[in-house]
């Protein structure tokens, strides 16, 4: 009987038929994902390597049997189901390019020429919009894009990631490295980059960039699907042609019947078996015919209008960028500052912003009226620091909010900020501020020290008195800063080896301390210990 009636003849001994049949069945059904048209010949050689002589004829007959079974196999049928998706991807990319770069594309363009036009358009856009080294590096990535099962390099500057690129590269990795299967789940939206996946461009350039990138991603999807659909048939034909050349020295014939008759001539009673196949012999033009079904422009499957709607009407750069509603006028507030940040420079800036007293000037930022410890007050309060009071502002005085005078050393160590608040409106009278840290001390000395603190003068006395008051605050601030600039936290070691942090003097040779006679050297570490000693939280 002819091979066309009983199937394809395989010229191997019958005792190897079981292993070889299983191998070929796994390839035809697609159950073994490690098998492909490129490595099946090697797998067959490994299965029949004990066959004496006639190795090329045995492999040739096995490849020819697979070739005839391929068109109707489940392996190829699953790939044929992806042909509409490939056609849609190509048609969408083609129509998108006709819309944004009509001068560089035409209806007769091949997918490869379409890719070159898209790459050229993106390269020009990156150079014209920015041209920085990162953009120039992405130009090399665009130039390296190849049609086929290849990952996309970095092609979009000034972005961390792009979802369509990640999707396509994951798909390539799955097909090439993991040899997985492509599921029939195709949506043009997943290949359209969002506005945050492109550089920050003008609206018109952003629409152009997103459209070109969407066309590029659809075209890459087409190349991936095209290779996935046609790769097995092309690889199998190449292997068949090579073994035919090795066996006969001639190129592959045009008709498969020639190859079938050649193999039937080697058949005898104990060196062959038949692999059942259905239908006629598979022509050697099958890969080209399959490719012709894939490289098609079908307007009925085009999704270009959908992509354009996503770009121009969806949440993206095609519409005005998301803009926040205007914030209400903020009250005159200064950011919270630490006491060490309240220097004379800040007070000078406050004086510069005073303006005219007619009420038309901006709100005056409040000054932190820190109750400073004068040289005499510091000596009197060595026994402890009492409660600190703020002057009660008069009704006509500028609005000054209560400020925590000097935070406790523990709070200062933990970077606690003084609460500085302000308002352009008249502020109510404030009562005295409770002590920040409850420290031992004579109440009479505490009250005397608080009375020594200068209060904010009334605005009725004029700007001159206010200026004088500010200068007094500057001097007081400098005294406080000199007092605190020589502090550090030390620990007295307990019996168990633990330490409780205390403040002591630092012997600094800073210019701020060279002329300070009442600094750390006067009272020594003892006075500072008794004045500021606190356990560290």
UniProtKB/Swiss-Prot annotation:
The keyword Acetylation does not apply. Coiled coil: none annotated. Residues 321-366, 378-398, 414-466, 486-537 are annotated as: Disordered. It holds the Pfam family DUF832. The keyword Protease does not apply. It comes from the Viruses. It is found in: Virion tegument. Keywords: Virion, Virion tegument. Belongs to the lymphocryptovirus BRRF2 family. This is Tegument protein BRRF2. It comes from Epstein-Barr virus (strain B95-8).
